[in-house]
């Protein structure tokens, strides 16, 4: 009976009490209970009741985008999916599949490997995804973002869908914004004045390494000098049609490590969980109106 499968037991009519249950648990991980429920793994009969079982749906937004020769194309998706899984576990939310094909800016779109969706298409597509999640009965959806290019289309879609509903709330946050420049400087992990921020830079590379160190190839990239800060601290938005001679990443990437990434991801994760729990408990996010 050691090789007796559940299917064999059922087909031969030998599904005796305890046999099927024991077979079903063969190979199950002890950590299974610590993992969140994933929407795509639900059976069809479960779908109609998910909103009554989970306080929030958690939707990760990633990208497929060139992040330098040393990083995987799915860097944003890898990071945000990893953090979203932990947040879903801790908040008992239902984890939705990540949205990977998203809008990428012009200065990365020309690199091989980047797959970009037009902003207006991204907005319409994302809005439809949100509508369908709400149609399941969820009144709270937390969108965890891993890609700067998603912010504009994301906010547009959220505003559109929120205007259509009477009692739903949609919360949007980007994981790296919980690691401010001031926080990064205080940690002293990276020598850059901006604390390691930047596309494909040491902060982002470290975060990827926290989840998939096997996908990092630091030997393929060289350190790049930090561009001068001409803003004097003023907030602004600059979009270039192309970045001439830019190699598709930034910063002193040799300073990246999985150990640093794990610490940074944990800081971001803890603050995100605090935000979501406060929102679920009080109906408002800190600082919102």
Model-found features: residue ranges?
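Extended, histidine- and acidic-residue-enriched regions that form the cofactor-binding/catalytic faces
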Residues: 4, 10-142, 146-289
């Amino acid at each position: 009976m050691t090789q007796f499968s559940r299917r064999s037991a059922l087909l031969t009519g030998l599904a005796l009490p305890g046999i099927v249950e024991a077979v079903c648990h063969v190979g199950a991980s002890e950590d299974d209970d610590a993992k969140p429920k994933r929407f795509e793994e639900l059976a069809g009969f479960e779908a109609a009741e998910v909103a009554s079982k989970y306080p929030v749906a958690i939707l990760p937004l990633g990208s497929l985008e060139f992040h330098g020769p040393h990083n995987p194309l799915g860097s944003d998706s890898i990071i945000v999916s990893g953090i979203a899984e932990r947040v879903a576990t801790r908040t008992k939310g239902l984890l939705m599949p990540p949205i990977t094909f998203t809008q990428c800016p012009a200065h990365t779109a020309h690199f091989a490997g980047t797959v970009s969706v037009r902003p207006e298409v991204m907005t319409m597509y994302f809005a439809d995804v949100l509508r369908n999640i709400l149609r399941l009965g969820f009144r709270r959806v937390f969108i965890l973002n891993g890609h700067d290019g998603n912010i504009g289309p994301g906010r547009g879609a959220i505003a559109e869908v929120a205007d259509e509903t009477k009692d739903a709330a949609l919360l949007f946050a980007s994981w790296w914004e919980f690691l401010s420049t001031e926080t990064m400087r205080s940690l002293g992990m990276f020598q850059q004045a901006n604390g390691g921020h930047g596309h494909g830079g040491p902060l982002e590379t470290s975060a990827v390494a926290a989840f998939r160190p096997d996908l990092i190839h630091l030997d393929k990239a060289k350190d790049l000098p930090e561009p001068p800060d001409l803003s004097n601290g003023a907030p602004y938005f600059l979009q270039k049609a192309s970045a001439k001679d830019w190699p598709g990443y930034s910063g002193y990437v040799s300073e990246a490590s999985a150990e640093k990434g794990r610490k940074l991801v944990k800081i971001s994760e803890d603050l995100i969980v605090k935000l979501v729990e406060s929102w679920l408990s009080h109906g408002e996010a800190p600082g919102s109106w």
